[in-house]
């Protein structure tokens, strides 16, 4: 029987998993410096969690959800995005209570699942990095979230990215805009795509996100939400924009930006990368916004919230083109070679001691001939080769060779007890 991975999935092998680890660690370090803490939620939830949060008319729910009935008759779905599960955890664990400092800031790095057409940077099992902040309705919470996304892309070395930003206002604004869109699209309903005709009666905002060719002729003249904003929404949006101006963050006010999920309210944003070697037009790598009613939707108290998500597959595609130096294999610090009776266990001890000091170290578990051990040291990219023979073992010494220039050093076993002392002797 030939076993293959399912369509739309990939094996992240050791030769590339280190690249993923580096990207994720960069994100973790940045989020922790901003006092965000990791949260881990189940990879599957009750179907209603996602159908209610994402919207029954969203592509995610209508076309892309992996859902099934389990053996207990429960309607279950694999998570298609990260926010809904985090909100459910926030409510179920009563994190809205006084025992938790607000805003409550978390991040996650996890696998998601959507039934999409597999293509470069997009798979049916994909990985997402995200942040969520609960409890503050202040404009600086929006600014902070946008800055985290901006700074992460900068730290990773992403080039030619641009912030697109818009606001959806509050529920009253959205209702007025909803009615305006219905009035605009109804006379041309028969000329719209099948999906947009269906959405017109449920959520016409989704039409603005349509990629269907037959819809494009109507989108440019569609009503703009900025014309329906109340004074409070305008003032809040202008505060966010003014803050970004003062902080030197460039942006484009994008009237067509609506985001693909129904739970967004207030400010929404996307970071788009313009790279002709990857895509014909600028493409989104990070997106998010404010969702002030989702906690209430899941029977929690009124709680403002804001967050964003990044698709790792697409991000990795960008970095492989724009910052390949980030993914260069750094090799290991030490490879311990040994020959002679009694040197095998000492080689193990030396490797463990070096690891305890924070170095990466490997020895030859196959105990091959010395020449073969040196070849392996070269193949794994060792910076230093430690040679341990019967003579060195008897004298309590080690010979260390720096492969970059061939310089050799003689060390005592006791030199391995202190990292600073060791470095002073081999980095001359």
Curated annotation (Swiss-Prot):
Task: For this UniProt record, give its keywords in alphabetical order, as a comma-separated list.
Answer: Aminoacyl-tRNA synthetase, ATP-binding, Cytoplasm, Ligase, Nucleotide-binding, Protein biosynthesis
**Matching Gene3D superfamilies:** Anticodon-binding domain, Bira Bifunctional Protein, Domain 2
**One GO CC term, this protein:** cytoplasm
E.C. number(s) listed in UniProt: 6.1.1.21
Where does the record place it?
Answer: Cytoplasm
One biological process term from GO is: histidyl-tRNA aminoacylation
Q: Which reaction does it catalyse?
A: tRNA(His) + L-histidine + ATP = L-histidyl-tRNA(His) + AMP + diphosphate + H(+)
Q: SUPFAM superfamilies of this UniProt entry?
A: Class II aaRS ABD-related (SSF52954), Class II aaRS and biotin synthetases (SSF55681)
The record ties this protein, via Pfam families, to: HGTP_anticodon (PF03129), tRNA-synt_His (PF13393)
Task: Select a single GO molecular function from the record's annotations and give it.
Answer: catalytic activity, acting on a protein
Q: Which NCBIfam families match?
A: hisS (TIGR00442)
Q: How does it assemble?
A: Homodimer.
Concerning its family, UniProt says:
Belongs to the class-II aminoacyl-tRNA synthetase family.
Stored HAMAP family:
His_tRNA_synth
- This protein's name: Histidine--tRNA ligase
Annotated source species: Lactobacillus delbrueckii subsp. bulgaricus (strain ATCC 11842 / DSM 20081 / BCRC 10696 / JCM 1002 / NBRC 13953 / NCIMB 11778 / NCTC 12712 / WDCM 00102 / Lb 14)
């Amino acid at each position: 029987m030939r076993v293959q991975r399912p369509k739309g999935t990939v094996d992240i092998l050791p030769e590339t998993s280190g690249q993923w680890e580096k990207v994720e660690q960069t994100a973790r370090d940045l989020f922790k410096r901003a006092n965000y803490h990791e949260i881990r939620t189940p990879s599957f939830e009750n179907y209603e969690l996602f159908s209610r949060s994402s919207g029954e008319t969203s592509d995610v729910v209508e076309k892309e959800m992996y859902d099934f009935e389990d053996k207990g008759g429960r309607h279950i779905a694999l998570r298609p995005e990260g926010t809904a599960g985090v909100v459910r955890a926030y409510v179920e664990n009563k994190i809205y209570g006084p025992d938790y400092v607000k805003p409550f800031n978390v991040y996650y790095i996890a696998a998601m699942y959507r039934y999409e057409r597999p293509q470069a940077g997009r798979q049916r099992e994909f990985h997402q990095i995200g942040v969520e902040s609960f409890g503050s309705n202040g404009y600086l919470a929006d600014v902070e979230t946008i800055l985290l996304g901006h700074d992460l892309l900068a730290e990773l070395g992403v080039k030619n990215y641009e912030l697109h930003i818009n606001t959806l206002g509050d529920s009253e604004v959205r209702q007025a805009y909803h009615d305006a869109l219905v009035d605009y699209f109804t006379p041309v309903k028969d000329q719209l795509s099948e999906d947009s005709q269906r959405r017109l009666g449920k959520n016409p905002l989704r039409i603005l996100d349509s990629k269907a060719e037959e819809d494009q002729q109507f989108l440019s003249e569609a009503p703009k939400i900025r014309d329906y904003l109340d004074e409070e929404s305008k003032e809040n949006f202008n505060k966010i924009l003014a803050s970004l101006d003062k902080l030197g963050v460039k942006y484009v006010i994008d009237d067509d930006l609506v985001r693909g999920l129904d739970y967004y309210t207030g400010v929404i944003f996307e970071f788009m990368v313009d790279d002709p070697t990857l895509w014909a037009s600028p493409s989104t790598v990070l997106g998010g916004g404010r969702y002030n009613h989702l906690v209430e939707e899941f029977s929690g108290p009124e709680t403002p919230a804001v967050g964003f998500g990044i698709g790792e597959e697409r991000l990795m595609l960008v970095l492989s083109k724009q910052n390949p130096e980030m993914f260069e294999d750094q090799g290991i610090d030490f490879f311990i070679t040994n020959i002679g009776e009694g040197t095998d266990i000492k080689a193990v001890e030396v490797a463990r001691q070096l690891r305890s000091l924070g170095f990466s170290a490997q020895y030859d578990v196959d105990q091959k001939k010395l020449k073969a051990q040196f070849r392996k040291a070269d193949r794994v990219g060792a910076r230093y080769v430690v040679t341990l023979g019967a003579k060195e073992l008897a004298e309590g010494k080690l010979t260390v060779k720096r492969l970059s220039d061939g310089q050799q050093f003689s060390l005592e076993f006791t030199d391995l007890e202190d990292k600073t002392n060791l470095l002073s002797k081999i980095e001359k």
